[in-house]
Amino acid sequence: MRLLARKKQMKQALDVAQNAIKRWPNNAEMFFLLGSLQDETGDKKAAFKTMEKLLALHPDNYQALNYVGYTLAEEDRDLDRALTLLVRANDLAPNQSYIIDSLAWAYFKAGKLDDALKEIRRAVTLDEHTDASIWEHYGDIAARAGLKDEARTAYQKAMELKPDNAEALRQRLS
């Protein structure tokens, strides 16, 4: 399946993942792979349902906790649940920058700027050189908190890491 996905043969990869789940209906890895493929192909609604099914079967799957929590936060839905899921994901997999970033983003969406700043600063110390989206979130959080220099630095780092998003970030700088 992963080979098919890498070769961008998504329809076949989705079919293989769905058949694997039929054969092994409790396999967490297969559910996560199917949800990830659905997300990658743009079927966010199906991906969310798949991750919810995964959580029903395996409530401590930190990847699914992160996916569902971040999705809820990103869509401004059920922020209390989003925070609960993301705190749990962080407890299960501490020091994972992408989970800490998701937690920071949920705090931001919930209007808890102090908590958001604390967590996003922690996320960038763990992953300062690779993930532009973490730096972009840092910029958004710092800007909302009125920390203009910090926001500028974060947006500039995001532009360095992902130059194709530079124009959108430049607009946030002004």
Name these PLM-found stretches.
Residues 1-174:
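Alpha-solenoid helical repeat scaffolds
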